């Protein structure tokens, strides 16, 4: 009840008090891990999730939690070691499939990333996160019919998705497919989310390819003034 009322600190306090370290109850341990993850307290989440993995190895949530913690620790390889050996048990579990696909993507294993994110999307067809990452994978692997289809779907289902507009624009300009459409998409992205360094950089790159060099320089300079560390701009 306290968790539902967003009184997470008191919920944790009560659960810790009733938790018996010598006889851990599954529901209490799972709830504690969930609360610590919600608080982004990954240290304590790990402590209780280790109990979950050790005492309840058949419970799926322990491996999923471990993968979440690993990804937040910038360790996709570790996340893969938790999920891959058990993935046959999670064939209908969106979270497990999505996390495994995301881990492979962060590890630059695009083939496996595509496989598991595609499975995740079959389980949960409305997953925008899966669509975004799959679109980037298709783009990087030259499967542009698939990437274009996903970008258009993302835009159609949410006209405020600046990332979809920008990534579609960048994809188009990189392959010089349709610069006018790329410009239209990029302008919309920048209208939705002004002062975004990567979005301004995309717009400048499009104007460069359209040989409108003054405009190109203007937007690249704006982008650089916001984020001078972007290696693409530098």
Q: Which role does the model predict for each range below?
A:
Residues 1, 34, 68, 102, ...:
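Residue-level recognition of tetratricopeptide repeat
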Residues 4, 38, 72-73, 106, ...:
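Register position in tetratricopeptide repeats
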Residues 21-22, 54-56, 88-90, 123-124, ...:
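Structural marker of alpha-solenoid helical repeat scaffolds
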Residues 25-27, 59-61, 94-95, 128-129, ...:
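Helix-start (N-cap) detector for alpha-helical repeat units in TPR-like alpha-solenoids
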């Amino acid at each position: 009840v306290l968790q539902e009322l967003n009184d997470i600190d008191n919920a944790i306090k009560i659960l810790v008090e009733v938790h018996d370290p010598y006889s851990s109850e599954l529901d209490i341990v799972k709830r504690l891990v969930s609360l610590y993850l919600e608080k982004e307290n990954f240290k304590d989440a790990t402590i209780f999730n280790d109990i979950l993995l050790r005492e309840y190895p058949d419970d799926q949530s322990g491996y999923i939690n471990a993968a979440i913690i690993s990804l937040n620790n910038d360790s996709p390889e570790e996340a893969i070691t938790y999920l891959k050996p058990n993935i046959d048990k999670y064939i209908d579990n969106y979270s497990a499939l999505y996390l495994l696909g995301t881990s492979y993507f962060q590890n630059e294993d695009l083939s496996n990333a595509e496989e598991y994110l595609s499975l995740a999307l079959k389980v949960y067809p409305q997953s925008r996160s899966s669509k975004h990452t799959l679109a980037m994978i298709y783009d990087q692997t030259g499967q542009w019919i698939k990437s274009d289809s996903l970008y258009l779907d993302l835009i159609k289902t949410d006209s405020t998705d600046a990332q979809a507009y920008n990534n579609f624009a960048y994809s188009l300009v990189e392959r010089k497919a349709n610069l006018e459409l790329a410009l239209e998409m990029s302008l919309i992205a920048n209208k939705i989310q002004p002062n975004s360094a990567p979005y301004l950089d995309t717009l400048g790159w499009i104007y460069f390819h359209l040989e409108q060099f003054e405009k190109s320089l203007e937007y690249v300079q704006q982008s650089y003034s916001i984020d001078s560390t972007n290696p693409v701009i530098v």
